[in-house]
Structures are given as structure tokens and as C-alpha cells.
From Swiss-Prot:
It is an enzyme of class 6 (ligase). GO terms for cellular component: cytosol. Pfam families: BRCT, DNA_ligase_aden, DNA_ligase_OB, HHH_2. It catalyses: NAD(+) + (deoxyribonucleotide)n-3'-hydroxyl + 5'-phospho-(deoxyribonucleotide)m = (deoxyribonucleotide)n+m + AMP + beta-nicotinamide D-nucleotide. GO terms for molecular function: DNA binding; DNA ligase (NAD+) activity; metal ion binding. This is DNA ligase. The keyword Manganese applies. Belongs to the NAD-dependent DNA ligase family. LigA subfamily. The gene is ligA. It comes from Rhizobium johnstonii (strain DSM 114642 / LMG 32736 / 3841).
Amino acid sequence: MPTEGSTVDTLTIEEAAAELARLAKEIAHHDALYHGKDQPEISDADYDALKRRNDALEVRFPELIREDSPSRHVGAAPSVTFSPVVHARPMLSLDNTFSQEDVQDFVAGVYRFLGRLPDQSIAFTAEPKIDGLSMSIRYENGRLVTAATRGDGTTGENVTANIRTIAEIPNELPKGVPAVVEIRGEVYMAKSDFLALNRQMEAEGKQTYVNPRNTAAGSLRQLDAKVTASRKLKFFAYAWGEMSEMPADTQFGMVQTFKDWGFPVNPLMKRLNSVADILAHYDEIGLERPDLDYDIDGVVYKVDSLELQARLGFRSRSPRWATAHKFPAEQAFTIVENIDIQVGRTGALTPVARLTPITVGGVVVTNATLHNADYIQGIGNSGERIRDDEHDIRIGDTVIVQRAGDVIPQVLDVVMEKRPAEARPYEFPKTCPVCGSHAVRERHEKTGKLDSVTRCTGGFICRAQATEHLKHFVSRNAFDIEGLGSKQIDFFFENEDASLQIRTAPDIFTLEKRQQQSLTKLENIDGFGKVSVGKLYGAIDERRSIALHRFIYALGIRHVGETTAKLLARSYGTYEAFETAMREAEALSGDAWNDLNAIEGIGEVVARAIVEFYKEPRNVEVITRLLEEVTPEEAEQPKTAGSPVAGKTVVFTGSLEKLTRDEAKARAESLGAKVAGSVSKKTDIVVAGPGAGSKLDKARELGVQTMDEDQWLALISG
């Protein structure tokens, strides 16, 4: 993680510009994982450190503030799975505070901005910050008409059908409410319901969920509303968007009105009149936190008077009248009993610390990721020191373990005073512990730097990679085959009977046929039965036709997650077109290669990984056999009858003045256009704003149609 504060002043303008560029990309990556995929890979504390570093650099170098700066944007672009909803009023994020001094500064800033003296009391509300999914629910004439996620703050995802299944959210409001009401709040899953769901998943041999927040978000994004209904989601109302008339003149009064209208509101919300009272309530909520049946990660403070809120106004992405006081990351001390190596489906060797059990934040922690060989030595991904030189992690060490934001626990540091005399430096394996193949750290072709990850070179001869690949193939967001969980995959993979073996994905779809010709019947084996085997065969047959993006994601191509798979499916339309293009791009040059790199959201690293995947004969052979059993469907395109840009490839460049870049992209895609990140022969339109540079030049050189923002808006408004 970056260091903060004093080092900012020592940077040159070139160093600051380079770091701001890196931070913009890194924070956008984490925003997409958290808001778009509900799969955070760093803790809230580490994310906040990145944001603070970015803010500190922008204060010191205001001339370097970027168009894509995290300080200008909220969240991440909405998913392409659900139709976009443009919020009538933006759903902004809150600034964070981390200490009593920060809170005192926030309150003092409110008084200063309003020209109030300390003896002229200003009331604040204080309420728990729910760790769930932000939601905006619109009612017209008392009836629920639309529900949308936060998305990027301007445009969210339409999840109306799923929201209607949440019992705590009324479909109709009492008589006499304003004609237009937008209720905003948090959808969450109770801890007790989360534990019950995981027990059910375990009993069914399925993969369990990571935490309530991600589970709630994933449940809300189900295409089948019946699945959402089965998840027992809950809701707290705490804010509003568009209102045709205001039923109260204070924050507290508005929330109490929501309660009167039938919405659940948090019972721990209070109205307070001093910093001392605010901080005391923060401590009270912190003490209650372990006993609450829902996750919280801080306390939100808001100026109570709506008149004063209006006077205070907003910064670019947050209100001046509110802040979120975050809880510190939860830490504990324990002992490293052993270090094991896990091998993933891409061959990554990940060290895991086996710990003396310790309770952190109400959860018993027995394992913690050590990430890679460098992390064990105290070196971060960027090559910087993250611990003192001698603070490498050894078996027998007493370590500080942190669990923040429900991310996998991590070892922060070593307590050197308690290091046993016999503790020896950990030697990272040079061979795969599963198959014995050589384990290497790849060197980046352009930078010459070693990858932080050590990988097994065994490929599919490595049992760990093969089984993990199969588990990925049948996972929830890939083929999602009910009855084929982790335990079942291990059983079929290790079986010596040819009629029961599943070693590659095509074997799944030939299982029933092989069983019909065998004397060894699956239904006679412990753990199975006639009914469950019948259901398994039925579940397999249901997946003989599958959405294109799920098929691509299931292949397990390195760097290709769900979002990237959807981009590829939308861009190529059919699997045949996709595979043909990847083969044509084999030389990493030419039109097919350029077209792949031009897809918005696909960079050279991802593009290279996809092409390399198709250059491997073993992969092509497995896919060929798979296509004999499975039919990938054509990608569903937006309904764009009469759209002047349907099917066209559009590139936006320069500064847009009437739309944000995300808005422009969402509008174009909703009309059936494909948005690319670079100009090629296949580009149809380049929309150029002030500051357009090389992309505009290339468009003119290739004879591509160019227009300004006003011409674009006129074209799509028709």
C-alpha cells in the first residue's frame, strides 16, 4: 500500500503524475470488483489508504487532477446484465473519517462554512453504516415503479423485479404520500440468514458463500427473481432521491416519515448536538457491533437540518454535510503453525498460513493468505517494502492478523520479540507440491520484472489445476450445474472406473451415456441414489445450451472474469466468431488483434492471455470435444429497433461536457452500439470533445466518421 503524507512533498511533478495514473487505474479496478462484481480483493482499510494517497497527491499537485480521477467518480459502471437506469438525482458516496480528530475537523468545517460560532448549536444525526448494497426505489402515485442499484452514481442497474420479492419493502405506500417518492437505503442479508444459507449449501455439496454483503449483492442480481425471493434479503431506509414534495424539514424527521410509510429504519439512529455526544454514540455502536444481526463498518453523521444541508451543498462526489466514521480494521495476535501451498486453476502457488485458532471480529480465524513469496519476505506487489527488513514470516512466529471488510484474513506483521530461536526463513517451493512440475515466476516481456506469482508449469497434468478448472467450470457464474460441487468433482476426478471419470469438461456431458454402458452404477455408490443421480443428469442436460458469456467465462482463460466474458460475448456475438478472431490474432498483430485490443475494458495483458490460450493445442482439443456436447447461444443484443447507431462501433475521445464518459457509454450501448477504446478500421464513429488527440488523428487518417458531442446527441435523439 502507498505511504501517505510527508513523502508527497518530495515527489517531482513527473513522479506525481505517474503515481496518479497508477492510482486511477488501481482504484477503478477495485471499484469494479466491489460495486460491479461484489468480489473485493483488498480490505476496506487498504482501499481507503489508496483513496487518501490519491487525495493527498491532488491537493499537492492540483494541476495534475485527471479526468478519470477517483475523486471525480463514485462506484463503478453498471453491469451489462440489467438494463440501465439513470438516477433522477445522483447517488453520491460519502467522505470517510478515521479518527476522533477527523470527526472534530468535519464538525468544525461545517460550522466554519456556515459562519456559525461554537455556541450556535447544530444538530447532527448518527446511525450505523450498513455493509450492504445501496438501492434507490422509486414510487409514483404510491406504487413501486423502479428499483436501481447505485452503479456509478449516475446510472444504476434495473433490479425492480428482484426488489419486489423483499418482504420488508412495500409495493404500495399509504394514501397521501407525495406523487413522486424515491427511497434510498441498503439491501443486506442478516448474519443468521447467511449462516443458515451456508449450512444449506454445504449440505447440498455446493460451494459456500464468502460473506453476507457479497451474498446479498449477488442474490439481488439474479436473473431469476425466485432465487432472490429465497434469500430472505432485508432493507434499511435512510435517505431519498427525487421527492415531489418534502414531508419533513430534518434528516431525522424524514427517516421517521419513512418508518410511518412502512419502511424499516435503523433503531440505533440518534439526533445529537455535540461532537462529544457523536463520538460517545460511535463508541456505543462499536460495543454493540458484535451482537448485531447485520454487518456494519462505521457510523454515518449528517447535519440534521435540511435547510443547512442545502446551504452546505456538495463537492464533486460527496456532500459537505455528511461523513462516514469508519471502524478500524479488526486485529488479533496468533501463531503461525505451518505454511501450506495451494495450487489454483491457473497454476498459481498461493501460500496459506495455518494459524492457532483466534477470534477476530466475532469470527474464528484459522487460516490467512500470505499471497506470494514476496509477501512472506515483506515485499509488496510494486516491489516496495511493506514490513521491516527482518520481519519475514516464519513457522512459529507470533503474527498480527487483520480481518477487515470481511475480506480473507491477512497477516500484517511479525512480533519479533516472540520469534522462537529455532525459527528458520521459509523456503518457497521450486516445484509444484501436487504434481512435481517445475514452479516458476514469469518475467514480463516489456518491463523485465518478475511476476509476483509463482506458477506450476504442469498444466492439465497437474491434478490441482485440472480439478480447480473443473470446479470453476461448474461454478455458479459459469455452467452452474446443480449437484456438481467441490466434493463431487473430487470424487469423479479421482475415480478409477472409466465410466465414472470426469477429468475434463466434456466428460461431464458424456457421464450418463458411459454409465448406461457400465455395470458400476452411480446410484449404488454411497452418497448418491436413484433420485439424486436422476437430478444430476437432468441438471447436466439443462446446460447443453448456455449463454455465450457463461461459456467463455467457464473456459477458465487467465484474466477473463465475468465482466470480461460479457464484453467478449457482446463484441463477437457468437462463439464461432470469437474463436475465429482469436485464431486470426495468433501473431499478436493484424486486424483481429487490433479489434480485440480496441474493446473497451480489454487491455493488452488480457488480450495476450486469450490469444495464448487458443494457441495451446490441448485447450483447442478440449473445446472441440465440448462443442460436440454443448451449444453456446448467440449473445443477446439490446432491442434497438430504429436506432441510428445499432451495430456500429463508437469511440469517445477528449472531454465530454454534457455527459460523463460512463453515461455516454451506457447510452450508446443501450442503443445497440459497441463502444471501443481505440480506433481501428472497424470503427464507425468517433465522438471527439475538447482535448481529443491521437484517436481523432487516426480516425481522420482512416476516413472514419467524426462528430462532436452535440452532433452525437442530435444523432441518437433522432
